[in-house]
Regions:
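Positively biased amphipathic helices and basic secretion/translocation or surface-docking motifs
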Residues: 1-9, 22, 32-35, 43-100
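Short Cys/His-rich Zn2+-coordinating modules
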Residues: 12-22
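Short beta-strand His + acidic residue motifs that chelate non-heme Fe in jelly-roll/DSBH
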Residues: 41, 138-141, 159, 177-183
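A short glycine-rich, His/Asp/Glu-containing loop-to-beta-strand
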Residues: 102-134, 139
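Glycine- and acidic-residue-biased ligand/ion/polar-headgroup-sensing regions
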Residues: 133-136, 142-158
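Short acidic-glycine-tyrosine-enriched beta hairpin
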Residues: 158-178
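Ligand-binding loop in jelly-roll beta-barrel domains
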Residues: 175-199
Length: 212
């Protein structure tokens, strides 16, 4: 079961269509395997349809907006059962290849990456797949902007906890971490970066000028 989910504001932006294509892809991947968040988005979609139908010219006040978020956070949600035998997820459709067959490029430590930003030509953010070998470590780093990540395979841990398959996490300039892949399987993630990461290790920080 997923332990790390998009917050209610993020789900509301997704429901309203106010999200870039790469970020929407991350949400769709999470929703495909998280019945709890899928039910919350269904609730938001229904609420939005009612508001559009009944009050198309009325703007949502700040207090009403807060009430909607509180309702989504606090109302009990009956998760719908996950369906087995689903078709290819949207990332597989986009790439046309299994994750294990992609042309990974080895980087520092036990990490490999594949930049797939070219699949989103209208976006300015960098979209990358990242892979840590089982038990491997990524270099310690922080972020110059926001990084949105979903775990596609395996799991990793850092100072914030353990992130397993289909977990969702958002990091920014305040976060410094050194992800470690759990034993048993390579950890593969999809990340969207608004700016390059910043290495913080004693020696690796010398490479910062060369990081895109």
């Amino acid at each position: 079961m997923n332990q790390h989910h998009p917050d209610s504001l993020t789900l509301m932006e997704f429901s309203a269509g106010n999200m870039t294509e790469p970020h929407a892809l991350c949400i769709r991947l999470h929703l495909d395997q998280c019945s709890q968040c899928r039910s919350r988005v269904d609730m938001l979609d229904s609420l939005g349809a009612v508001m559009m139908e009944q009050q198309p010219q009325v703007s949502v006040s700040g207090s009403m907006f807060g009430t909607i978020l509180d309702r989504i956070d606090n109302d009990p949600v009956e998760p719908e059962p996950l369906q087995h035998g689903r078709p290819l997820n949207p990332l597989q459709k986009l790439l046309g290849e299994d994750l294990t067959k992609l042309p990974w490029k080895r980087q520092l430590c036990d990490a490999s990456v594949l930049d797939i930003s070219d699949h989103f030509p209208d976006q300015t953010e960098q979209v990358v797949l990242q892979k840590l070998t089982a038990g491997g470590r990524a270099p310690a780093h922080t972020h110059r902007g926001q990084e949105t990540t979903i775990v596609l395979q395996g799991a990793f841990s850092d100072n914030k906890g353990v992130f397993k398959q289909w977990d969702f996490v958002v990091l920014d300039e305040q976060d410094v971490h050194k992800p470690v892949a759990l034993q048993g399987d390579d950890c593969i993630t999809l990340s969207i970066l608004s700016a390059p990461v910043k290495l913080t290790g004693m020696f690796t920080r010398l490479l910062n000028p060369f990081i895109r």
